[in-house]
Structure formats: structure tokens, C-alpha cells
């Protein structure tokens, strides 16, 4: 590890500890030549995910692009920045869990929408309007109707599951 100040290659580790919920190791080092201290992080290097764009072009997954899009969608809502970061972390973790190293931009968009939906309706519709390229008010109305219908369906499913669980308990 080269010293960032004098480029000397020999240093000693003063302290090591887990960081980022155990996802990395933080090391405090001291250069043996200039005696200045610096911090390094060790992280697991994942095989990069390749995104297949709508035009067929391929590029490396860029977390900052997704984060920027979600932050814009969540602007002036009550969604805290930490929750946005967690949403993008969850998406990235889900992509890393896949056996395929390629994903379409459409799949990423749908994943973001699925994560935004329970989080904030306004952010969901804003993201959908850009991702699905809304051309006018009719597109917004259509998306809102679909959103409401799905919300009612989700509510009905939850009630049915609770009834089934109650029935199973009473049958025992």
C-alpha cells in the first residue's frame, strides 16, 4: 500500500476494525517514511454487473446513476436520504445475488419501482414518469389507476391471508 502523501510503500497498521456493517475492514495506517497517517478500506470485490441498455449497448452497473434517479424522484418528499441509500443498497445486493451478471435497464427500472412503491407514492409516480417516458396527463392518470388497483389487490390479498391463517389456527 503506497502512502498517499509520499508514495513510500512501507507502512504499519495501527488499528483494524469492521466497517459498513461488516461489509468492509477499515485500517488506520502510518507511513514508515513520512510518519503521516491515513485510512484504507478493504471490501469484497464483486464481479461487475453489466447493464444492457434499451439501444443494446452494454455498460457497467453504475450505482450513482440509480441513486441520482431515486433521489430526484424523492425530492421534496418525506423520504430520508438514509432510506434512499438503503433502497439502492438493496437493489445492488439483489443484483449481486443473481446468477447472471447481465441485467437489462428495464429490469433495473422495474426493481426500483417495486422498491419505491411501498416507500412513497409520489416518488413512485415521479420515477415511473421518467422511466416509462410519460407523454402527458393521460399517462399519469393511467399509472395512478394501476397503482390504486394494485394497492386494493394487495390489501385484499393481505386480508385473505389473515383470514386463512385465522382459519388454520381455529382448525387446530
Curated annotation (Swiss-Prot):
PROSITE patterns in the cross-refs: ATP_CONE
A Pfam family this chain is assigned to: Zn_ribbon_NrdR
Cofactor descriptive note: Binds 1 zinc ion.
Known cofactor(s): Zn(2+)
Keywords (A to Z) from UniProt: ATP-binding, DNA-binding, Metal-binding, Nucleotide-binding, Repressor, Transcription, Transcription regulation, Zinc, Zinc-finger
Top-rank taxon, per record: Bacteria
Similarity comment text for this entry: Belongs to the NrdR family.
Protein task: Negatively regulates transcription of bacterial ribonucleotide reductase nrd genes and operons by binding to NrdR-boxes.
Protein name listed in UniProt: Transcriptional repressor NrdR
Species: Gloeobacter violaceus (strain ATCC 29082 / PCC 7421)
